[in-house]
Amino acid sequence: VIDAALWIAFAMIAMTALTSLAARRMRVPQSILLVVVGAALAFAPRLPAVKLNPELVLLLLLPPLLYYSGVGMSWRGFRKYLRPIMLMAVGCVLFTASVVAAATHWLLHLPWAVGFVLGAVVSPPDAVAPMAIARRLSVPKRILTVLEGEGLVNDATALILFSFAVGAVATGGVSIIGAAETFAIIVIGEIAWGLAIGWSLLHLRAWSKDTEVEMILALLTPFAAFWPPHFLGGSGVLAAVTAGLYTSWHGPKLISPATRLQGFFVWGLAVYLVEGVVFFLTGLQSRLVMEGPDAGEWSRMIGAAIITVVLVVVIRFVWVFAAAYLPTLLSRNNDARRVTPTWQETFLVGFTGIRGVVSLVAALSVPEMVGTEPFPERDLILFVTFCVILVSLVGQGAALPKVIEYLGLDKTGAAEAESAKRNEVTARVAGIRAALDRLKQLMGEGAVARSAANLRRLHEGRLTDFVHTSEGIDAAPVAEAAGIQLQLVAAERASIASQYAAEKLTDEARRRIERELDLEDARIRHAADSAAGNGFGEI
């Protein structure tokens, strides 16, 4: 069994890498192609069915994704847009679950509690796929912030509501007041726990002053934040997100530069792999979902899926437009009109209600038995959830780039990005001038003249490059200089390789020199990209 599991895991990782490469070449969203390929392989003959273990995803795969999203989230942006984020992450989730429960109760005669289970499962959108597309097309920052913030919090709302609904099915009812009190306790408790974990482990990392120990503590942080609240009856989501947000805000002051450099690569690879495997696993579940219903149930299942798909799309649009414009229409304060989003921005937020892994995990977590009886409508919940995920991810996800271009938000975002780039260059110029001022002080204090002169020429050259960029002067000389520098680094690499081959260098010395050359290569590419405005210098 262990051998089979290892082979399956290895095969999934390999297929994730190959499919991601194909998605890049085909210029389609990676998440969509991973789900499609996974679904196709699920029905391939002679291949074993792969059943997703929801506890495995919740305990091992979800915490690092949540924590990493929290670290990448701007705390200033989160605070600035807290109201719309909470309206979407809490209000829209509860509204969607309630309407789905009512509709399925009246149209499909589902018990109220079962309807709320289905509503809670399909209510939280997944921000991974739409965020990747929106960033690539330079959507305005405020939209990205709202979508990202919604994605951080809505999972917690949905999973807590899901646990209440499953409990109501088992017990036959639930107290609304009691549920509200429990919800408040969970929210406050998880935020407090997330802050405690974020503070303690971040300061422990700063105290350790050891890069490897810091990285181990960083990798343990999401699990330390998520697991205790989860096992105590909460969701764990808010705790992991809060720990990430705390690290995002205070990390730059406490994390060493070496750990930060290493963390970029470690976390980037880990999250890339986890996201890919999760979407691939989502596609692989299609066979198990399709084999569940009895032959006579298909018409009812398909009808339920159509109703739910239409509902979740329409409900989100209704909520988004109402939340955006009703407060302005009802407000007597004219200042409120100046912060009202455009209809294009509102439409895009409404359109990005793509469901993903949390919905699938919640559906698979529905127990098979309630006491001695089968859980009512479990197969229907699984089938409908998978249809909602597939239609929203493949349908809305594939159409999202065209919708963004049609609304003209790519042009708005491009202008905003250009303004942000100018601000970045201005900040870089100020930083270099501060370094030059400090260099003059050191020269006055008796610093070695030759070293100071070399450093001064280096910083003045960087200053000239960024001043030219800020003034709109052709950046071609900067790119040309970067190309020459990279050729020099390549020549140095070749020389080191030949000397190592001639046994003039030890392995340890070769690795030290290669690491220095790698850092120099990365610095040159980073600076060239920043000057040219390509992705703000991301490597």
Predicted regions and their residues:
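Transmembrane helical cores of multi-pass secondary ion antiporters/exchangers
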Residues: 1-421, 426, 433, 502-504, ...
